[in-house]
Structure formats: structure tokens, C-alpha cells
């Protein structure tokens, strides 16, 4: 059966002070003392309360528990590295460490106190079609961890400081020596009590609980470039989480989702749209007004324009996000067939068809109809 959390047993938070822990222990130990409480599980609960207090009332045991929980960091084979061992009896074998490097990953032990870069963050932003095309400036709020202002990132209560770990004497490592038929082997492990830092916090900062960090929402002003597209991302340098031990902060990556437009479609820097034409406009030609992202323009439709014909409006597309000019707008015309005709309109169309004579049988469409007719007659 898994052990219960010590903080849960005493009914205190992980940021509880020594006095709060002591007060909770006295109250619970009195309630569940076997001489007072005659319930069957009282003795077991009393034992559990006592064990929790013994750990949480001791600074180093508490630091060890906060890092590893109930697990024993000295168990198992994890953490084995070539640099964990000092092969005293193999001084003549210069390549022995290389062999361990090959099989176990090698590399020197990372200094836990060395500066490390902060984590990168990702934020998803939704833009309208127009905002993506023309760009915008806006403020966003990012939830992130920041350095605690109370302890300035040390994790220690103001007026106190971290103390040297008495288990590893500030080295961050614990060594065990073993004699083998091949010589003396010294096994060096990360100190489980200080986590390899060589220090521990005796009195924790009550604001951050000893972590040196707090969760906050950071307001950031963002300038979105014109021409950003769906799925693209923008890197904002230095706006990720703060670095560790004086390391540089991480970066913020904003990923954009662009809403579709009801009229325009985008493909890269080019814009596509469809414009309806009547029979008369397509047959006789016309000059129409076409909406673009940059305002309305006049487009000349030549006589005899067929449905599906594409016209290009140069430079009327999306500005390139890297500043390489503008894309184009492609206008595709669709000839609309009327569905509700008056008797007069029907009569006029019949007359038009009669007046057209064999004109429909000329050109590519006419040749197609002739081939169909011959096929049904069996002509070759």
C-alpha cells in the first residue's frame, strides 16, 4: 500500500512553517493517542502522524522528502554514469573511461549550480483575415513562472541564506568506496539531501515555498508583421521563463491561427475570389467593380468571356511577411444561369437561339457537338 503524503497526514500546506507543523502535530497526536482514542486504527494513525512530524520538523529530512518523496534515491541502478566512479586500481588504462562513455552516455557531471537558460513558452493567437494581412500591435498576457520578488530567487526567507549541506559537506556528491578483485572503486552519487547543490534551505520563503519562483501573468506588447499566415509562428526573444542560477531567459513563440474570409481565399501571398457574370456581360463584355484587400478596382471583361476564365490583378494580394513586395489577386468569373424567367425573357432567348443559327457549332464547342452527332449516327 502506498504511503500517504506527509503534508496531507498533518493537514498542512507544503509552504507551512515549522510552528504550523508543530501545532498540527500536537493536535493530531493528542486526538489519536492510543491511550485516549480507542478506535481500532488509532494506533496506526498515531504512528503515521509521528513519522510525518519527524520528517517535516527536520530541515534536511524535509528538503529530502520534498525532492524525492517516499522514494529512496539510493535504490536502483538509475543515475549510473562513467564519471560516478573513480577506478583507483586502473590508473594504467587511460581508455577505460572512454569505454564507459560509449556504453553509458559519458559526459561530465552537470553542475546543478551552473547557469541554465529558462524554458521556452508557446502561445496561440487567433487573428481575423484582415489582421493577418495588414498586421497589428496588441498586448497579450502570458502565464509563466517568474523570479520571486520576496527572496529574489534564492528560495530562502528574507534575512536568511542557504546553508552548506552537512551530508555532502557542500560538494553535492556522496561517495561510497568498494573493494573489488580489480581494485578500489569509489562510487559518487548526487547527494539526495541537497539535490547536488551542496546547499539546503533552512528557512523557506513563505511567498514561493522555497522554489524561488512564483506563477504570474506577464503583459507583453507584440507587433505582428503584415502578411503572417495561418500556422506560422513569431519568436519574441527573452520573453520565456527566467533563467536558472543567473542563466538567460527563454523565448516566447506565438503560433497564429487565421480565421477564414467569407469572400477571399489565400494561397501564400496570392488572393483568389470568384465574381458572378450574367449571360449578357459574358457575351457582350463589360467593365465591373471588383473588391480587393486594398479597395475596389475596375476590371474590363472582354466579350465572349467563358465561365472559369481567370484574371490577374497584379500587386493586389498579400504583403510578403519578409518584405518582398505583394502577391497578386486572381479573379475567377462564373457565368450565372438564370433560374426564374418571365415569358418575355424566354421568348427573347428562343429568338436569340434562332438568330444565332449555326454560331454555336463553330469554334471548339461546335466541333465537340459535331463529334457527338456523328458518333450517334455511326459515322467515322
Swiss-Prot record:
Localization (cell): Cytoplasm
Gene Ontology CC terms: cytoplasm
Ranges of residues in domain J: 5-69
SMART domains with a match to the protein in the record: DnaJ
Zinc finger feature spans (CR-type): 135-217
GO molecular function terms listed in the Swiss-Prot or TrEMBL record: ATP binding; heat shock protein binding; unfolded protein binding; zinc ion binding
Domain of life: Bacteria
Major site of localization recorded for this protein: cytoplasm
GO biological process, one term: protein refolding
Subunit structure: Homodimer.
Sequence similarity: Belongs to the DnaJ family.
Role of this protein: Participates actively in the response to hyperosmotic and heat shock by preventing the aggregation of stress-denatured proteins and by disaggregating proteins, also in an autonomous, DnaK-independent fashion. Unfolded proteins bind initially to DnaJ; upon interaction with the DnaJ-bound protein, DnaK hydrolyzes its bound ATP, resulting in the formation of a stable complex. GrpE releases ADP from DnaK; ATP binding to DnaK triggers the release of the substrate protein, thus completing the reaction cycle.
Protein name as catalogued: Chaperone protein DnaJ
Gene that specifies this protein: dnaJ
Amino acid at each position: 500500500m502506498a504511503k500517504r503524503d506527509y503534508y496531507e497526514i498533518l493537514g498542512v500546506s507544503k509552504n507551512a512553517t515549522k510552528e504550523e507543523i508543530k501545532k498540527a502535530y500536537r493536535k493530531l497526536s493528542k486526538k489519536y493517542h492510543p491511550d485516549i482514542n480507542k478506535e481500532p486504527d488509532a494506533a496506526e494513525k498515531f504512528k503515521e502522524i509521528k513519522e510525518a512530524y519527524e520528517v517535516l520538523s527536520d530541515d534536511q529530512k524535509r528538503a529530502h522528502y520534498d525532492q524525492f518523496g517516499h522514494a529512496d534515491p539510493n535504490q536502483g541502478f538509475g543515475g549510473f554514469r562513467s564519471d560516478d566512479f573513480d577506478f583507483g586500481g586502473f590508473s594504467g588504462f587511460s581508455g577505460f573511461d572512454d569505454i564507459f562513455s560509449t556504453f553509458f552516455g559519458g559526459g561530465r557531471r552537470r553542475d546543478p549550480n551552473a547557469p541554465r537558460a529558462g524554458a521556452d513558452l508557446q502561445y496561440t493567437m487567433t487573428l481575423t483575415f484582415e489582421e493577418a494581412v495588414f498586421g497589428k500591435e496588441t498586448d497579450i498576457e502570458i502565464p509563466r513562472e517568474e523570479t520571486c520578488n520576496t527572496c529574489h530567487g534564492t528560495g530562502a526567507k528574507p534575512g536568511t541564506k542557504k546553508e552548506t549541506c552537512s551530508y555532502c559537506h557542500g560538494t553535492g556528491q556522496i561517495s561510497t568506496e568498494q573493494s573489488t578483485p580489480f581494485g578500489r572503486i569509489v562510487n559518487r552519487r548526487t547527494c539526495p539531501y541537497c539535490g547536488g547543490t551542496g546547499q539546503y534551505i533552512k528557512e523557506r520563503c513563505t511567498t514561493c515555498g522555497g522554489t524561488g519562483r512564483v506563477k504570474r501573468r506577464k503583459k507583453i506588447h507584440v507587433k505582428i508583421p503584415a502578411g503572417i499566415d495561418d500556422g506560422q509562428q513569431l519568436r519574441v526573444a527573452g520573453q520565456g521563463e527566467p533563467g536558472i542560477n543567473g542563466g538567460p531567459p527563454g523565448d516566447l513563440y506565438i503560433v497564429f491561427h487565421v480565421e477564414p474570409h467569407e469572400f477571399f481565399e489565400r494561397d501564400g501571398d496570392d488572393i483568389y475570389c470568384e465574381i458572378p457574370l450574367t449571360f449578357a456581360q459574358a457575351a457582350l463584355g463589360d467593365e465591373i467593380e471588383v473588391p480587393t484587400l486594398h479597395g475596389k478596382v475596375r476590371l474590363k471583361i472582354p466579350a465572349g468571356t467563358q465561365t472559369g476564365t481567370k484574371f490577374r490583378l497584379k500587386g493586389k494580394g498579400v504583403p510578403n511577411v519578409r518584405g518582398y513586395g505583394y502577391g497578386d489577386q486572381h479573379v475567377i468569373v462564373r457565368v450565372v444561369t438564370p433560374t426564374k424567367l418571365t415569358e418575355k425573357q424566354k421568348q427573347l432567348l428562343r429568338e436569340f437561339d434562332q438568330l444565332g443559327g449555326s454560331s454555336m457549332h463553330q469554334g471548339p464547342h461546335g466541333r465537340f457537338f459535331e463529334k457527338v452527332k456523328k458518333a450517334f449516327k455511326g459515322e467515322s
